[in-house]
Amino acid sequence: KLGSDFQKGLEKLLDGNQSVSLSDLKKQLTQKHSKVVLGEIPIHSASPNKLYDHICKSVLVMGRLYNCGKCSKWHTSMASAFVIGQDGIIVTNHHVLAKDEGEILGAMDNEGTIYAVEKVLAANQQDDLAILKLRDAKLIPMSLAKPANVGSDVWVISHPNRKLYMMTKGMVSRYHMILNNDRKPGRRMAITADYAKGSSGAPVFNRKGQVVGVVSSTSSIYYSVENGKKENLQMVVKNCIPVESIHELIQK
């Protein structure tokens, strides 16, 4: 039901001219830094079920309203985001905004309330991060942790393939650099917690509910390539953005 409510809410924002166009938001992706007042809300170590109940209040569904060109209906794409400031300051991936298709971008909380994106505060393509401000949003923020050590337990709450608010567990497996599409290096933190399409922009957090990273992408490892076709999938590496990349975008 939340999924259908999200599309209806985005259509209402568009019809009521209550949102900034996606094309205008994309023009703001050149903003490199912004002053952000973080919501430092401490959480003592908690059981996974209590963590889930608490963190879900800070995790958002992000989505673009678009027309496929093959029918007259609107469609939505879904990604993830999370709150870091009480006045509607959120984090998601740069690539969530940078894709071409779409009229508007919006967000929805776990109770089904829809929010328009007001503006882009800061963004970095290499680190695949964007910090946005939602209009008229008073949400519960997550706090940012220090960098997590390799071997640390981590959790993810995201929306893989429209399966909203799914929680998975793993550990930090390594830190490394990758080359982006423009051949510029970006920092990454690999984890073993599962996620899939629709999880982009989701928080990676520790047992205290503090953010240690942001879901970004996956990289599949195949045993062989025959006639240009990859065969025998062995492993899927989960690449995330380390928390220090968020700190570099914000000016406290």
Please describe what each predicted stretch is.
Residues 52-55, 75, 83-84, 122-126, ...:
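Extracellular/periplasmic catalytic domains that process cell-envelope and extracellular macromolecules
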Residues 78, 85-127, 134, 150, ...:
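Catalytic-histidine neighborhood of serine endopeptidases
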